Every structure is written in C-alpha cells, then in structure tokens.
Amino acid sequence: MHDEEKKEPKWVTAVSIAGRIAGMGLAVAAAVLMSTASQCTVYYAAPAASAYGGAARARTVTYSDFPPFVFLVGAASIAAFLEAIAIFLVVWKKGKDKTTKVLMPLLGVAVPALLYSATGAAFAAVSDMSYCSANGKRVSICAGSAAAGGGVSGGTNFCSQVHIAVYLSLAAAVAVSVAEVVRGLGGSASGGGSDSDSSSSSESGGCDHGCHHKH
C-alpha cells in the first residue's frame, strides 16, 4: 500500500507524456523545416549609379550559411531523440528501475537546455540575416538594403521558413518545460500525501496499542 500511495496521479503522467510527445514532434518539425531552408536564390539589384549598373546579381543562400541555424538543427534533432528515450522510460519502464530514476532528471535538464540555447542563438541570427555583396555592401536577405540603395528579392520564402522553424523550436522547449514542471509538482504532491498518511496511521496505531494495554 505504501508503494501505491507514492505513485504520481494518472493525470500528471498523462500530461507529462503529452507534453513530451508534443515537444518531440515540435523539435522534429523545427529541425526538418530549418534543414530544408536551403538553395534559396536571392537577387540583389545594385543601384544604377554603381559599377554594376543596376544589374541583379544572384546569391544562393542556405541555412548552413548561418552557424546558429546549423546548431538549431543539431540541437533539435538531439532533443527529439532524448525525448523519445524519456517517453520510452515513462511509458514502458514506468519509471521504476534505477536506470530510469537516474536518467529522467538528466533528460529533464538536458532537453530544455538544448532547445532554449539553440532557439536563443537562432533568434539572434534571425534579427540580422545578411551577406556581403560583391561591391562590398552588406545586403539584408529579408529586406532591401537601404544603405546600398538597391533592393532584394527572392528571400521571402527562406526568411518565413527560418522564422517558423525558430518558433517551433521555442514551442518545443516550452512544451518540454511544462511536462517537467507538471511531473515535478505531481511527484512532490503525491510524496507529501504519502508521508502525512503514513504519519497519521502511525499515530493512530500507537493510540490503539496503548488503549489495548489498558484493557
């Protein structure tokens, strides 16, 4: 009976598993979407007064041109794999064996850390996606370069795809964090109830024992 009382409520387990599944799915989606943001051809129209006479010069842009995006793909992929392990331990191992008790806290820290760090780095890179053109001007991929006096086209799809991937990574981090918080609160609540119940039963047992001796 004492072991049964220590089990976390079913709704806690259900919410935790749902959060982990959602986090894993979002992490996979973020990695896939970011990794397919490639071979985007951006056309930069140089100013007519420049040496290039207003000619549109093509530049192929891919996510691998930006290290933070590469980091996000790797981190999201690893996080999804680790979450799959966590789901296996919770669903099939029931969290009972020693290996599960050791791994679950580590996974609970590692997965959000990976996702949050990768998302933060990607957000910083998204705010300044640009490259240096042949005439030495810094060209923004998502918007025209006012300083150069020219314009950029062809980067809309790339920018949209990158932005969505970053937000998916953030959503995955939040989902995993919520699952961990719910699991932690549920476990502490069930543990506290078990201690109080055992304490009260112990006290009542002592009282009954004393009364029995009086007779």
From Swiss-Prot:
Main location: membrane
Subcellular location: Cell membrane
Signal peptide interval: none
InterPro entries to which the protein is assigned, alphabetical: CASP_dom, CASPL
Top-level lineage group: Eukaryota
Protein's UniProt keywords contain Disulfide bond: no
Cytoplasmic side: 1-13, 90-105, 183-215
Transmembrane portions of the chain: 14-34, 69-89, 106-126, 162-182
Membrane topology: Multi-pass membrane protein
Any single Gene Ontology cellular-component annotation: plasma membrane
Keyword field: Cell membrane, Membrane, Transmembrane, Transmembrane helix
Compositional bias per record (Low complexity), positions renumbered to this chain: 195-205
Pfam families attached to this UniProt entry: CASP_dom
Keyword Cell membrane: yes
PANTHER family given in the database record: CASP-LIKE PROTEIN 1U1, CASP-LIKE PROTEIN 1U3
Family to which the UniProt record says this protein belongs: Belongs to the Casparian strip membrane proteins (CASP) family.
Designated name of the protein: CASP-like protein 1U3
